[in-house]
């Protein structure tokens, strides 16, 4: 029933707000890594994928940087962990895109995304989790997809990602937990690539790969929090995790080497929600970034007694929480996995604040 439910769910992900629904791709983890992402070619036009990859490469990575790092990235493939390098080679074969370019793009996504994530608990103890995924490149709207990962013949977990990307920034393990990831660091791209390579050589893992492994392996919310807190990463990140029981919500602020802060829900003292953007929650954001403030004002106005999935969606749809760079919005609850909903935000949000 769960397998069918997830497929129906993700195929009809606009049932609450029926617009801009991404396609769904089923990935069979029982296949060899090289074969897993072959279903991409049944959903996406390969020529369109190649064109989109070219646009991203030319805008994300300056030509001189691509020429400098391309050969180096290829030589570093032996340091990329299983099964991701094999999956990347499989994608390269089906799309006829240089595997080094796909690897570069997979790493570039790690430190160029801006997001808002919210976890909230109502007075009955139900947990709601929502996120906006923001990115400067509109072409990603054409690459956005929902993914259902099957293992041992059953739907194991699901998420939202981009064609050609093997990690997850948004995901759900049904009846266990949901998780989203937000970029933390704001270094220049060149420095990030240098640090990324250094971390790779030191056994650091991309944050989105750790998320995917956690979705696949963690037994419950507590186990997920431990798994997301410990491993060395290639970049700093915020992990926002929500469970199925009252109090199971937390923001994990990660350095490359470990946790910098753990910020749990605390409804007994008024902390019934947590809003995380791309700044440490104990620091003021940039004056030009009002996402956190706007979300908190809206949540306080709604109140814990009235929060639900629809109200959370309304908060995420407000400007400037949603802006012209917002690629997609996801709403999810691990206790009610059929409510997993992703909407592509066509052309972003331009409405005034209310």
Language-model region placement:
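Internal mixed beta-strand/loop scaffold within catalytic domains of large alpha/beta enzymes
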Residues: 104-200, 209
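Loop-centered beta-sheet repeat module
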Residues: 180-182, 188-228, 235-237
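Context-dependent free N-terminus signature
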Residues: 1-2
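C-terminus-biased signal that marks the final domain/tail of proteins
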Residues: 5, 9, 15-114, 215-354
């Amino acid at each position: 029933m769960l397998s069918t439910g997830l497929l129906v769910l993700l195929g009809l992900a606009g049932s609450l707000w029926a617009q801009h629904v991404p396609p769904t791709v089923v990935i069979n983890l029982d296949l060899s890594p090289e074969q897993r992402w072959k279903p991409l070619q049944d959903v996406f036009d390969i020529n369109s994928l190649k064109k989109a990859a070219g646009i991203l490469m030319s805008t994300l990575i300056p030509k001189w940087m691509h020429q400098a790092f391309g050969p180096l990235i290829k030589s570093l493939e032996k340091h990329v962990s299983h099964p991701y390098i094999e999956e990347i080679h499989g994608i390269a074969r089906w799309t006829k895109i240089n595997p080094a370019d796909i690897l570069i793009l997979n790493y570039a996504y790690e430190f160029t995304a801006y997001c808002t994530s919210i976890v909230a608990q109502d007075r009955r103890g139900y947990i709601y989790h929502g996120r906006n995924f923001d990115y400067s490149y509109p072409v990603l709207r054409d690459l956005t997809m929902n993914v259902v990962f099957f293992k041992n013949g059953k739907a194991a977990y699901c998420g939202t990602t981009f064609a050609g990307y093997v990690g997850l920034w948004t995901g759900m393990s049904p009846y266990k937990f949901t998780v989203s990831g937000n970029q933390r660091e704001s270094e220049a791209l060149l420095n990030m690539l240098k640090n990324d390579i250094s971390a790779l050589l030191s056994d650091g893992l991309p944050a989105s790969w750790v998320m995917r492994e956690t979705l696949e392996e963690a037994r419950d919310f507590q186990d997920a929090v431990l798994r997301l807190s410990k491993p060395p990463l290639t970049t700093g990140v915020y992990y926002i995790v929500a469970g199925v029981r009252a109090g199971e919500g937390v923001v994990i602020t990660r350095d490359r080497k470990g946790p910098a802060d753990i910020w749990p829900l605390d409804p007994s003292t008024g902390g019934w929600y947590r809003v995380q953007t791309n700044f440490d929650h104990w620091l003021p954001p940039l004056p030009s970034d009002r996402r956190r403030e706007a979300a908190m004002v809206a949540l306080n106005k709604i109140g814990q007694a009235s929060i639900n999935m629809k109200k959370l969606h309304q908060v995420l749809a407000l400007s400037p929480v949603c802006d012209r760079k917002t690629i997609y919005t996801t709403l999810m609850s691990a206790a009610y996995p059929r409510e997993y909903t992703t909407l592509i935000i066509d052309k972003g949000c331009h409405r005034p604040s209310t």
